[in-house]
Amino acid sequence: MAVNVRDYIAENYGLFINGEFVKGSSDETIEVTNPATGETLSHITRAKDKDVDHAVKVAQEAFESWSLTSKSERAQMLRDIGDKLMAQKDKIAMIETLNNGKPIRETTAIDIPFAARHFHYFASVIETEEGTVNDIDKDTMSIVRHEPIGVVGAVVAWNFPMLLAAWKIAPAIAAGNTIVIQPSSSTPLSLLEVAKIFQEVLPKGVVNILTGKGSESGNAIFNHDGVDKLSFTGSTDVGYQVAEAAAKHLVPATLELGGKSANIILDDANLDLAVEGIQLGILFNQGEVCSAGSRLLVHEKIYDQLVPRLQEAFSNIKVGDPQDEATQMGSQTGKDQLDKIQSYIDAAKESDAQILAGGHRLTENGLDKGFFFEPTLIAVPDNHHKLAQEEIFGPVLTVIKVKDDQEAIDIANDSEYGLAGGVFSQNITRALNIAKAVRTGRIWINTYNQVPEGAPFGGYKKSGIGRETYKGALSNYQQVKNIYIDTSNALKGLY
């Protein structure tokens, strides 16, 4: 299936500052391509420090009035954004597919609708938020107010460009903040098109979108003195840099980083559910998911029964044209990611690991211009293996045999990460006990990779700081002010 790219995507994009697309301070641009075909989609402006400074100052000015708008006004604007996203769902989903390489069935059913739902959700959250009053005694009262922080500086990863942007923009502006946000330089196009919705709905300067390199303009956003709150989704290595910037400027930061999550299949699991859940855990979005269930821990009693079923399931996955509704897995997002995946396959071949399924780049039937990789299953002898410890970020699943629940817990916790995990069992008490013992921010039971609004998402350990996607995330973007009132009109007698 082929579409006319210009029906969806402009040939060039400027920076979105103060409600308008504007030229950058430099004439430098970055080429944006379709990873499935190599086709050039657009050229974006390469923002410089001067552009970051301009955007932050605009956001500061807009904050003065935006922070004073009523909650009901803000809620209505968020609902309008969500409604318009859904009205343009098919167009924005196609842009996401063209730019990211993920299947159209995913962008249409998940990425864009869930982004819209986050705007609707945080509209309701801000409308129903209430402060508190504590009558300390008959003469003194403590009032707790939740106030916006100011200007939010955010950078989001390339794997879910629009959805991750919604995770940050919706609560930030719901709370009364303004935001300067930068998408990945390789996948910026959906957010740039959605800027046209912001243009229609929001006052100027509330949302500002910069494009450029993370190491340049992204770093400048996080280190700007005018930014009051940092929010980042991406690798743990870059997360350290964002945390350092937050410490240097003494501002709060929300960090959603890497993972190496364990998906535990117990001997009493429903194997039909387990096989589907395993695929959801590692093949969804081509495995380019921070919460991917990339370590499969299988009870030894069912190992020989489950593994052949997985081999068959993996071999039947339709990998191909992301625009085809029948495609189940599309292209990896770029050559760097494909090369990284291949390096782990090479490491497996040079070790005592055993490749049970896949392990190859796909180039036949017109796939040679893209970055397609087979669903891959690799048995490793133990959790100390390189493939069991390092985040691959692709459709590569390592499988480890375990003898009992405690060994599964111990292996699951033997990781520097703690973002997510899964347990498959028909005994809910057994599953809950494991879920409570595994040190991660999210555990799915009898499913995987479900990310609805209303359920907190975030990690332990090196997987990050803070939680997103639920009502408590609003507090990430607020200051708490206490007003203490003494009505006694009496001297305290200390001086």
Swiss-Prot record:
- UniProt: NAD(+) binding residues: 212-218
Give its E.C. classification number.
1.2.1.3
UniProt entry tagged with the keyword Aminoacyl-tRNA synthetase: no
A Gene Ontology molecular function term of the record = aldehyde dehydrogenase (NAD+) activity
Quote the Gene3D superfamilies the UniProt record gives.
Aldehyde Dehydrogenase, Chain A, domain 1 (3.40.605.10), Aldehyde Dehydrogenase, Chain A, domain 2 (3.40.309.10)
Q: Which residues form a coiled coil?
A: none
Which chemical reaction does it catalyze? an aldehyde + NAD(+) + H2O = a carboxylate + NADH + 2 H(+)
InterPro entries tied to this protein:
Ald_DH/histidinol_DH (IPR016161), Ald_DH_C (IPR016163), Ald_DH_CS_CYS (IPR016160), Ald_DH_CS_GLU (IPR029510), Ald_DH_N (IPR016162), Aldehyde_DH_dom (IPR015590)
Which terms are listed as keywords in the entry?
NAD, Oxidoreductase
Active-site residues (renumbered): 256, 290
Q: Can you tell me which family this protein belongs to? A: Belongs to the aldehyde dehydrogenase family.
Q: What is the name of the protein in this document?
A: Putative aldehyde dehydrogenase AldA
Name its species.
Staphylococcus aureus (strain MW2)
Gene it is expressed from: aldA
